[in-house]
Amino acid sequence: MKIVAVEPIGISPEKAEFFKTEYAKQGIDFIYYPDRNEDPNELKKRMFEADIVIVSNIPLSGDILGCCPFLKMISVAFTGLDHIDLQYCKENKIVEAEKTDVIRTLSG
């Protein structure tokens, strides 16, 4: 399984490295990008192999999501889903969730 945080989502690179190490013990790859990049082509590259994507408010269109053959879940690190193509998610059985407590959990 591969979890991809496509942007910093409020955690430090050190904390991301800690999660990468802990997830690896469970056979899970955790990929963290320390920069925010909204370019659709870059997002497609970052998300291509992801089973789970963690994002804040970067827009994720059906075009971008359509390039992610393994995607099963999008976790929004803040509130609101209006930047996610929910129709695409529904049609492709991708679970979307907003998690206001993700940042507390990751940074605590």
Predicted regions mapped to residue ranges:
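Phosphate/diphosphate ligand-binding glycine-rich loop within oxidoreductases
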Residues: D51-G108
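N-terminal glycine-/charge-rich "phosphate-binding" loop or analogous flexible N-terminal tail
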Residues: M1-A50
